[in-house]
From Swiss-Prot:
GO BP annotations listed: enzyme-directed rRNA pseudouridine synthesis
CDD domains in the record: PseudoU_synth_RluA_like (cd02869), S4 (cd00165)
UniProt-listed Pfam families: PseudoU_synth_2, S4
Top EC category: isomerase
Family classification: Belongs to the pseudouridine synthase RluA family.
Keywords: Cytoplasm, Isomerase, RNA-binding, rRNA processing
The name this protein goes by in its record: Ribosomal large subunit pseudouridine synthase D
UniProt source species: Escherichia coli O6:H1 (strain CFT073 / ATCC 700928 / UPEC)
Cellular compartments per GO CC: cytoplasm
Molecular-function annotations in GO: 23S rRNA pseudouridine(1911/1915/1917) synthase activity; RNA binding
Amino acid sequence: MAQRVQLTATVSENQLGQRLDQALAEMFPDYSRSRIKEWILDQRVLVNGKVCDKPKEKVLGGEQVAINAEIEEEARFEPQDIPLDIVYEDEDIIVINKPRDLVVHPGAGNPDGTVLNALLHYYPPIADVPRAGIVHRLDKDTTGLMVVAKTVPAQTRLVESLQRREITREYEAVAIGHMTAGGTVDEPISRHPTKRTHMAVHPMGKPAVTHYRIMEHFRVHTRLRLRLETGRTHQIRVHMAHITHPLVGDPVYGGRPRPPKGASEAFISTLRKFDRQALHATMLRLYHPISGIEMEWHAPIPQDMVELIEVMRADFEEHKDEVDWL
């Protein structure tokens, strides 16, 4: 059943020059800016008694605003006692270090057992925030840092920060192949035309930019540090595969394990057992959505990636004299 929403207020003189959707988001902080924008486009907002369907319309201050809308009841998700590795928490945000094998949001094939279910158990009031405060995601088997909003105002501002590319996210990865230099992949990404669960570089896709630099060379693999400008689904995985250096272990965009000639049994065994993309969100930097203070967190790579890198490093040292690019 839909919930009726009827709101009235007067635009403050201090809001002179703001976009209508921005002004209303400040006036009604219990509702996200994206929701308010939908109401404006749906002609649910009156300004001085007249319908206004332009979110970008500038306000002058003093206008009488009325909203008459409905909110469809969202799917109800159950709280579940799933441990969360909390790196930081205050009244407005939570930063977690997500493990592998944990989906962020319920969906097809994963109706529960997700970060969202864990958040509902850990902090029940987060149920009042759209999507339980989740503003960005990590793939199921990508580990590392992600930020969650505990309130609607915090969520609104974090989403705006993401859109303005003010949140810095850096990753560590291990890619297949010897890479000679860092660089940037600036290629649009969209759904794969035939494999609907896959993404692909496509000229009609959404803009996507990934910067990468080399941290360490191995014989036939490369350890990378990457920074996202955008946050498309599977972005790093798709971009690295596009430049013919897919991530080790990637079950979708990678290839079969390729140990170098003469590799030890330990190397071969570790590589074959590594059954996820070698990708970890290692650094997160943002401006706090309420205080505006710049904050930064780091999460070391998990043990499975540590072991992978150690066997690759040992193999490189053992066969250094055979490498032709040194």
